[in-house]
Curated annotation (Swiss-Prot):
One of its GO terms (biological process) is methanofuran biosynthetic process. InterPro entries: 4HFCP_synth, 4HFCP_synth_arc. This is (5-formylfuran-3-yl)methyl phosphate synthase. It comes from Methanosarcina barkeri (strain Fusaro / DSM 804). Pfam families: 4HFCP_synth.
Length: 234
């Protein structure tokens, strides 16, 4: 499992990088689950990491606004993100999801075809009036995206495991692989979740709170990053 860690600034990015993260993910928790940070923060993080890890950037929790989303995705790509990640929040239909991801993918790939698009659904999709993550792999593959993810939409301390069980998450990762996509699991994950995550076998796990001592509003701690890296490699 690759480890994606989500700092909010250059200082945290350096800690995540030194601690051994595989992917450094720039987000802004003040603006939501996949809240977007500023272009200059992405550039600063890119410079601080200096090629040691690829950079991911979230562009927001999006409802059906393909124009706005594609422009945001283009901005993240230009700012230096290697992975551009969008959340499908309050997406009502599969057709809406397909158009949103297709337009984002076109915006990113027209600029640089080596950059990857990550489409994220939400384990608590019923709470946020969106589509099931299990529908996402086939839609994302059709749209030309590279990675599908499941996260929690509402950050109230509840974990992805409170909304999707092990079998559902295994189905999600399996569907992703059948569609030729990488997959990722995130959403208030804890150290005690690692054994079940190993059984599920996602390509990537995404964390913030776990390496902030359990509170995602605190700062990332290098010793917790190193502990997580060691446990993932054990």
């Amino acid at each position: 499992m690759k480890l994606l860690i989500s700092p909010i600034n250059k200082e945290e990015a350096i800690i995540a990088s030194r601690g051994g993260a595989d992917i450094v993910d720039v987000k802004n928790p003040k603006e939501g689950s996949l809240g977007a940070n500023f272009p200059w923060v992405i550039r600063d993080v890119k410079g601080a990491v200096n090629g040691r890890q690829p950079i991911s950037a979230t562009i927001g929790d999006f409802n059906y606004k393909p124009g706005t989303a594609s422009l945001a995705a283009f901005g993240a790509a230009v700012a230096g993100a290697d992975y551009i990640k969008v959340g499908l929040y309050d997406i009502q239909t599969e057709d809406q999801a397909l158009e949103l991801i297709t337009k984002i993918t076109q915006a990113v790939k027209d600029y640089d075809s080596t950059k990857k698009v990550v489409a994220s659904g939400y384990s608590d999709y019923k709470r946020i009036n969106s589509i099931s993550p299990l529908l996402l792999p086939s839609i994302a593959a059709k749209a030309g995206a590279d990675v599908v993810m499941v996260d929690t939409g509402i950050k109230d301390g509840k974990s992805t495991f409170e909304f999707m069980d092990e079998e559902e998450l295994k189905k999600f990762t399996g569907l992703a692989h059948e569609c030729g996509l990488e997959n990722a699991i995130a959403g208030s994950l804890k150290f005690e979740d690692l054994p079940v995550l190993e059984r599920i076998g996602p390509d990537i796990i995404g964390v913030r709170g776990m390496v902030c001592g359990g509170d995602r509003t605190n700062s990332i701690r290098q010793e917790l990053v190193e502990k997580l890296v060691a446990e993932c490699q054990a």
